[in-house]
Amino acid sequence: MAGPLIVLAGCEDGTYLVEVGASADEDQLAGRQPGAAVERERPLGLAPAWAAGRVLDVDARGSTVVLLLDRRPPLVVSHDGGVTWTERGAGLPPGRAVALGEHPDHVLYAARNRLHVSGDGGVFWRALAIELPEIHDVAWG
């Protein structure tokens, strides 16, 4: 394995970052030393309001992770593999968030019947002009 594989697990008491090791003995909650005791209250290191949100989708490339949450603002971004997080998406419209689309240079966000694209990790967003029927999922072609 080239680097740690990070899995985000939405659980009853929050969202957990889990590092998948080369073997079961090496699996751990992200940021923990191997063999350290696992504490139940290790949700992502996010503020309590963020941890209360349910993760709807994830876009992860290298050390950058974008989470789509079921709350406002709908996005949180980490550029250090989940150690620190920043709220993003304040300019996105209210309403039900649907999905994120992965791309090496852009983040795609879908809400109801409109797509929004960001080329800077979610700081600024541009709504695409076309209006679609209700969107259920997105992917780059």
Residue ranges and their predicted role:
Residues 1-141:
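Extracellular glycan-interacting surfaces
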